[in-house]
């Protein structure tokens, strides 16, 4: 259910495999974003279960766990939200501080060395060609595309086993879109289970191994992508 206690998802049964990109498609308001937020522990799940297989083949139950509890349990899950400034990055902070915020969420703190986060900020800036005069500038001063590069780069740097991505290319230029698609493909090749919501159907078909179609909060079907 959402914050207003309205049921947004109903009887959703999905599996995402390691080394796979699962796309979530549907018209606006079908529950795509809410599905990712539920997996990430940001939406209340009234019934059912969300399970993650560990390295030994055992199951870890995520249902009922919020995002903080998921991190504290050492569950390797990263989430790139639709809201880049706010839920994603803190607009008034620079890149280094935003890297540190992620470390706090991982339980590393309160006395955190800035050298590691600063090095990560420099690495993301160079590798993803983030256009900013300095990593010390507030991220709010960056363009939407550059903010998205920083956010995606930060989450991928956590080396997650599961990567959830909501509308990663909304409102960004074509070059940034290609960079992000390449990053998602690289994660797939590393064996990460990627779940993403992308609005462009042609991109979904090309990028994703399988696509789950949501309609009214329910799965109406799962189809193979062109890359499958």
How would you name each of these model-derived features?
Residues 1-228:
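Glycine-rich phosphate-binding loops of nucleotide-dependent enzymes
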């Amino acid at each position: 259910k959402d914050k207003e206690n309205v049921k947004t998802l109903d009887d959703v049964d999905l599996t995402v495999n390691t080394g796979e990109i699962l796309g979530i498609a549907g018209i606006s308001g079908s529950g795509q974003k809410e599905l990712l937020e539920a997996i990430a522990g940001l939406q209340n799940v009234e019934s059912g279960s969300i399970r993650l297989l560990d390295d030994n083949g055992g199951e870890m139950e995520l249902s009922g766990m919020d995002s903080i509890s998921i991190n504290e349990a050492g569950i390797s899950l990263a989430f790139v939200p639709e809201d880049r400034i706010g839920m994603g990055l803190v607009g008034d902070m620079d890149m280094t501080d935003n890297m540190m915020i992620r470390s706090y969420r991982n339980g590393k703190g309160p006395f955190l060395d800035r050298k590691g986060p600063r090095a990560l900020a420099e690495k993301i800036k160079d590798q993803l060609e983030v256009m900013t005069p300095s990593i010390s500038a507030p991220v709010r001063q960056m363009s939407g595309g550059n903010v998205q590069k920083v956010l995606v780069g930060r989450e991928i740097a956590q080396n997650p086993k599961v990567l959830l991505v909501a509308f990663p290319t909304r409102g960004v230029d074509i070059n940034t879109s290609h960079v992000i698609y390449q990053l998602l493909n690289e994660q797939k090749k590393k064996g990460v289970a990627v779940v993403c919501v992308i609005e462009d159907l042609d991109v979904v078909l090309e990028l994703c191994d399988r696509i789950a179609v949501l309609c009214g909060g329910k799965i109406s079907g799962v189809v193979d992508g062109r890359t499958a």
